[in-house]
């Protein structure tokens, strides 16, 4: 489980000192209590066993670095050394000129020291210090140790308000003062510089330091140096030189290191309040500060990988670049050992070079070129926010004080935690490293130039791969998961407390501290403005004329009485208005009810009118359809439609049935019988229509077996009007009966024509009937030919057609007359009604006029 900075996403490592903090501490509401307890945690002494272990490991690292630096210097050719010296002299020439012109002596409370010239500093070996200056440094070191011992034994005093801004970093990063904060610091004022900081930026390669080292190095700023006065700056330089001398004496060799860490540098300020300011700092002296760059001679750097080692759970040192002098390739000296107190610019002058906002400058490590770093495992964009391994504080689990993970409000048991650890073991093998083992070095040493030897790089890569394989084979302890979870939960709680996402790297910590200082300065300005305004108000007039106040009071009392009277009047008016509003509301309610009833009646009548209109439209449509149907019925006649009389050549037809026969066109008797039956039915229907009764004969319509009965003979005789094709003796008698029946039918037609002529004298038939002759043709079948008989039957049907036409015409005339008679009756009735209505209206008008006259 990797840790990343929440601003720049730089990879970080967890420090064991953070796990000593009780997370319930941050649940307190009083911030002062939190600060006091964190200060107590920061002053815990380091065990002696751990100190010895750290010293041994640092000595081993130094020996390895010296061997690698010597090998690299021996391999490097003199030609490349000369080229690099020329290159660096060209790069840093301007800075040397600036420092030669601006080099001054820092002000110290002791006797001032002389500033060496730039020519003396350009030599590969540092110049010897004067005896007076060495005695002065020893005295300062002794006072520094006494003060640090005093602060380590005495309890911490409550921090005053003025110093809380300076201790903001110390408040939220208590692990910077714990036992795992630096490489071999003994919290007693003595600084052990025998080892090289594992995460020093000036080590030559860009490594990921532990959180404690980032926090310690970030606390060193010009503000913290200047707060202690000139004494603290001189003590700092003296400590650096003394520590370097002690390291050289112990190892009897020249140490190639570009990083010197000083821990728990305690300085007592010269202010009137004589407040004790404890500033725990880790100063990283590299080639970033312009004053130090001017004093360091031209050197060529060769990258030498160092074997990673674990020092108390902290991050091992990445491959550090050893600096070799251009004059000699075998002897490698540290640039920090050649720095004298006079080479460090005074805090007052450094503060003059700050930004317009007067933000304190910090001695920051060198900004490495990221393009020169290539990872053997996988490339990482360390300063971009597009990293897929960004850490979200909201997703971190909460870890209890006993090490159990709190899931959904309850702590998981031991078995569950072990199962969880086994479940996530694959993930931990790939993403996290055990706290007890040395972590994998993810970045190779930084190549200072293109002339470095490639063999050293290959050896360092092989060593790194072997170390990675060994570390991957080591079993990850179950405690590591809970340690990481506990640390992450601590970051989460601290994030909720200070409203800043944690953890943060060194640069981001400095930025956040600067932001907090800006906010504090703004708030201080506001406080000063408010305090000045308050003082101005307090210094104002406290005594005024009582007479004027009395007059104003009387005027105000009078105005108050007037306003009270106005308020009483307004209350009375308000009551009256409320009564009026109640009355008006009652009237509005009654009017609304009347309006509702009116509109309901209106809607009902409106609906009725629409319904009546619909009914009227329906009745008019029905009347129109009935009239049209009536007209069509008037134009039709039952007899005319039922009996269609026409002709077919020489044959007369009734309903397309031929009546008669010819030699050339023989007709069957079935057709002739059916035609005679229709003729008998037509004549009988016309007689009944005209309400006429024949005198001698009675027509009996019976389809194909119709006949004519004679009534004046007793018993009555029946004459058949149908025949057959049978040839027998009885056929002779049949001809006689058939001929008599046809003669009787002609006689009936003649009687009906005479009856019609009585009603309508103008009526006449085209063919006259005289006994058995019609139109001069004999109708008998016996003793005549077929042509004559067929023609006589055609004349008979023609007379029937004329009679039918007259009946239809007469019937329409009678109907029309009846309609006119009924219409005239209706008109007469309407006229009578109108006359009566007019009379009634006149009478009513007269009565009304009389009533009006009386009134």
Curated annotation (Swiss-Prot):
Where is composition skewed (Polar residues) in this entry?
A: 144-156, 368-377, 413-445
User: What top-level branch of life does the organism fall under?
Assistant: Eukaryota
- Encoding gene (name): atg6B
- Which lineage ranks, top first, belong to the organism behind this chain? Eukaryota, Amoebozoa, Evosea, Eumycetozoa, Dictyostelia
Coiled coil, from the record: 538-595
Keywords (alphabetical) are: Autophagy, Coiled coil, Endosome, Membrane, Protein transport, Transport
Origin species = Dictyostelium discoideum
- List the protein's name: Beclin-1-like protein B
Q: Which family does it belong to?
A: Belongs to the beclin family.
**Localization (cell):** Endosome membrane
Which InterPro entries does the UniProt record give? Atg6/Beclin, Atg6/Beclin_C_sf, Atg6/beclin_CC, Atg6_BARA
Question: Which membrane topology term applies here?
Answer: Peripheral membrane protein
GO cellular component terms given for this protein: endosome membrane; phagophore assembly site; phosphatidylinositol 3-kinase complex, class III, type I; phosphatidylinositol 3-kinase complex, class III, type II
Ranges for the region named Disordered are 92-212, 236-271, 294-380, 407-475, 826-855
Q: Where is the composition biased (Low complexity)?
A: 99-123, 131-143, 177-200, 294-348, 446-474
Q: Cite the GO molecular-function annotations of the record.
A: phosphatidylinositol 3-kinase binding; protein-macromolecule adaptor activity
What is an annotated GO biological process for this record, any one? autophagosome assembly
Which purpose does this protein serve, as stated in its record? Involved in autophagy. May be required to recruit the atg8-phosphatidylinositol conjugate and the atg12-atg5 conjugate to the pre-autophagosomal structure.
* A family per Pfam: APG6
């Amino acid at each position: 489980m990797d840790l990343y900075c929440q601003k720049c996403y730089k990879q970080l490592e967890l420090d064991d000192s953070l796990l000593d903090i009780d997370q319930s501490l941050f649940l307190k509401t009083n911030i002062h209590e939190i600060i006091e307890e964190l200060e107590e945690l920061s002053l815990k002494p380091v065990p002696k066993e751990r100190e010895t272990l750290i010293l041994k490991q640092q000595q081993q690292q130094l020996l390895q670095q010296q061997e690698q630096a010597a090998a690299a210097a021996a391999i490097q050719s003199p030609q490349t050394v000369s080229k690099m010296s020329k290159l660096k002299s060209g790069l840093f020439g301007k800075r040397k000129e600036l420092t030669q012109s601006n080099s001054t002596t820092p002000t110290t409370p002791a006797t001032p020291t002389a500033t060496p010239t730039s020519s003396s500093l350009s030599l590969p070996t540092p110049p010897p210090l004067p005896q007076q200056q060495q005695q002065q440094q020893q005295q300062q070191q002794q006072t520094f140790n006494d003060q640090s011992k005093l602060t380590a034994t005495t309890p911490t005093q409550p921090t005053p308000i003025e110093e809380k801004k300076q201790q903001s970093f110390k408040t939220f990063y208590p692990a910077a003062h714990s036992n795992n904060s630096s490489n071999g610091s003994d919290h007693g004022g003595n600084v052990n510089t025998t080892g090289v900081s594992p995460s020093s930026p000036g080590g030559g390669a860009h490594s990921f330091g532990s959180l404690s080292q980032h926090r310690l190095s970030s606390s060193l700023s010009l503000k913290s140096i200047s707060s202690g006065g000139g004494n603290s700056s001189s003590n700092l330089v003296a400590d650096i030189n003394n520590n370097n001398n002690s390291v050289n004496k112990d190892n009897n060799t020249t140490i190639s290191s570009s990083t010197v860490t000083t821990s728990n540098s305690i300085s007592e300020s010269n202010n009137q309040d004589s407040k004790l300011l404890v500033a725990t700092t880790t100063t990283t002296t590299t080639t970033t500060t312009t004053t130090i760059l001017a004093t360091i001679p031209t050197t060529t750097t060769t990258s030498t990988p160092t074997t990673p080692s674990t020092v108390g759970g902290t991050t091992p040192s990445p491959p550090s670049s050893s600096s070799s002098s251009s004059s000699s390739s075998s002897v490698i000296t540290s640039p920090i050992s050649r720095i004298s107190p006079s080479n460090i610019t005074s805090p007052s002058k450094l503060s003059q070079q700050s930004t317009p906002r007067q933000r304190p400058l910090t001695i920051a490590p060198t900004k490495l070129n990221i393009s020169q770093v290539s990872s053997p495992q996988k490339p990482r964009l360390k300063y971009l926010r597009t990293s897929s391994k960004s850490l979200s504080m909201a997703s971190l689990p909460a870890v209890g004080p006993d090490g159990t993970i709190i899931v959904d409000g309850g702590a998981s048991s031991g078995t569950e935690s072990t199962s969880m650890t086994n479940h996530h073991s694959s993930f931990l093998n790939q993403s996290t490293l055990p706290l007890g083992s040395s972590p994998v070095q993810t970045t190779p040493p930084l190549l200072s130039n293109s002339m470095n030897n490639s063999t050293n790089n290959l050896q360092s890569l092989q060593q790194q791969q072997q170390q990675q394989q060994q570390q991957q084979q080591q079993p990850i302890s179950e405690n590591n998961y809970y340690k990481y979870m506990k640390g992450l939960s601590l970051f989460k709680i601290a994030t909720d407390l200070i409203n800043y996402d944690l953890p943060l790297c060194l640069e981001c910590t400095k930025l956040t501290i600067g932001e907090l200082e800006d906010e504090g300065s703004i708030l201080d300005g506001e406080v000063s403005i408010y305090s000045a305004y308050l003082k101005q108000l307090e210094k104002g007039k406290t005594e005024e004329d009582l007479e004027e106040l009395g007059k104003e009071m009387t005027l105000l009392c009078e105005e108050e009485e007037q306003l009270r009277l106005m308020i009483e009047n307004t209350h009375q008016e308000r009551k009256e208005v409320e009564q009026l509003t109640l009355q008006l509301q009652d009237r509005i309610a009654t009017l609304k009810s009347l309006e509702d009833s009116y509109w309901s009646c209106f809607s009902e009548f409106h609906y009725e009118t629409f319904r009546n209109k619909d009914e009227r439209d329906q009745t008019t449509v029905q009347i129109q359809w009935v009239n049209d149907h009536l007209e069509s019925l008037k134009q039709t006649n039952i007899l005319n439609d039922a009996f269609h009389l026409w002709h077919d050549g020489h044959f007369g037809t009734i309903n397309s049935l031929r009546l008669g026969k010819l030699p050339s066109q023989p007709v069957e008797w079935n057709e002739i019988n059916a035609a005679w039956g229709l003729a008998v039915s037509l004549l009988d229907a016309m007689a009944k229509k005209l309400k006429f009764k024949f005198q001698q004969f009675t027509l009996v319509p019976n389809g194909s077996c119709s006949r004519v009965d004679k009534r004046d003979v007793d018993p009555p005789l029946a004459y058949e009007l149908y025949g057959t094709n049978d040839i027998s003796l009885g056929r002779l008698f049949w001809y006689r009966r058939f001929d008599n029946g046809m003669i009787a039918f002609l006689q009936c037609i003649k009687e009906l024509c005479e009856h019609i002529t009585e009603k309508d004298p103008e009526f006449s038939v085209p063919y006259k009937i005289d006994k058995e002759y019609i139109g001069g043709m004999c109708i008998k079948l016996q003793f005549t030919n077929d042509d004559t008989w067929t023609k006589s039957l055609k004349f008979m049907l023609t007379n029937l057609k004329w009679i039918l036409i007259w009946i239809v015409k007469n019937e329409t005339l009678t109907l029309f007359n009846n309609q006119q008679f009924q219409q005239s009756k209706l008109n007469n009735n309407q006229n009578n009604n109108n006359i009566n209505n007019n009379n009634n209206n006149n009478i009513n008008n007269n009565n009304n006029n009389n009533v009006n006259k009386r009134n």
